[in-house]
């Protein structure tokens, strides 16, 4: 079941796509703030949450998001907001169906998982695959309780962690080029990274050069999970980006 807010058909749709291991519940803070003005959809990606029985592939995930936009988005179009794994899926959707995507915001996804960059993806997959699930689940729960307030952590716990699906997803990303896909999307894009996300920040300029109409944003005092570390700042960026798109398209 895809979580959604507001049935007002005049409100632009935003589809939020979560990161590896998490679920659509990772966007609870953004939906709470943005649901007043936007129709928000927070699907679980294949291999995760309610879709954990569906094997993850980049193309398969993109096709499911495209089908969701066709089925649920107002006017059959949406702004895509993706973090990490969700950012890569969002890029894939925008490249294949640009007419369905009015804007593209990606966070922590400005590196092609190839060559040396692929080592980080492979390494995390190995850890999640080899460490017993009860152990890694305990570590994740400890981390989220320590790092985030209950208003953020508890919905994530309720949505569940999908470690096996995360392993498959990480390995599916390896060897895939996403900057050319970003270049194929002619619409506006917003590239977001956390100040302390030193894995994705160095290659952000290359992604910005590839994008047709890019904007860049750095979220201070944030790591890779920028929407959770600084939820208010992240939400303000998305509201401003989405509002600008609506204004430029003649939609208030």
For the regions a language model picked out, list residue spans one by one:
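Conserved alpha/beta-hydrolase catalytic His-Asp/Glu region
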Residues: 115-116, 133-184
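Active-site loop/turn elements of alpha/beta-hydrolase fold enzymes
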Residues: 45-48, 109, 221
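Flexible "cap/lid" loop of the alpha/beta hydrolase fold
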Residues: 91-96, 101-131
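Conserved HGGG/HGGXW glycine-rich cap/lid loop of the alpha/beta-hydrolase fold
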Residues: 2-52
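Conserved loop-alpha-helix segment in the C-terminal half of the alpha/beta-hydrolase fold
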Residues: 32, 188-222, 228
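Active-site loop/oxyanion-hole signature of alpha/beta-hydrolase fold enzymes
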Residues: 29-32, 41-81, 236
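Catalytic active-site module of serine/aspartate enzymes centered on a nucleophile-bearing elbow/loop
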Residues: 214-252
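Gly/Ala-rich beta-loop-alpha elbow adjacent to hydrolase catalytic centers
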Residues: 82-86, 90
